[in-house]
Amino acid sequence: MDLKKFIRSIPDYPKKGILFRDITTLIKDEKAFEETINQIIEKSKKFNFNKIAAIESRGFVFASAVSFALKKPFIMLRKKNKLPADTHSVDFELEYGKATIEVHKDSIDQGESVLIIDDLIATGGTAEAAAKLINLSKGSVAGFIFVINLFDLKGCDKLIKLGYEVENLINFPGH
């Protein structure tokens, strides 16, 4: 199944000059969503990991389904002040400013290997921050799996240069 056909492209969203890749059309089709999860599971076989983490919020859609199917614990990497217990935090740069992601301090035990799943990678800033958060928690990053790679924005290349293994399902230009 060509999953690319299930991604809606919306020009000038959220601002002029951006071509938004919308996953809602993928996840509303049960066969396309199932195929997406199956492809992520297949790609995950190359990684050795104890837990699965995802970045708020669209990454949760895919990672929680994979976590359930593989019977692996699921960790939420959330925006600042969204988690109720003690957290580790990492600040990072966005295209429009700064952001912070957090994880509960008790989510990852020392030495655990974490697979990070997200819906999309663009410049790689959020993914790099997620990796820093896993490392700050005394875990290690097994690798990344993205549903969509905006290849000309070079986020996957950035992660690979940092020494991480990266897989993705669909390639699109960023603009």
Label each residue range with its predicted role.
Residues 1-175:
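PRPP-associated nucleotide enzymes
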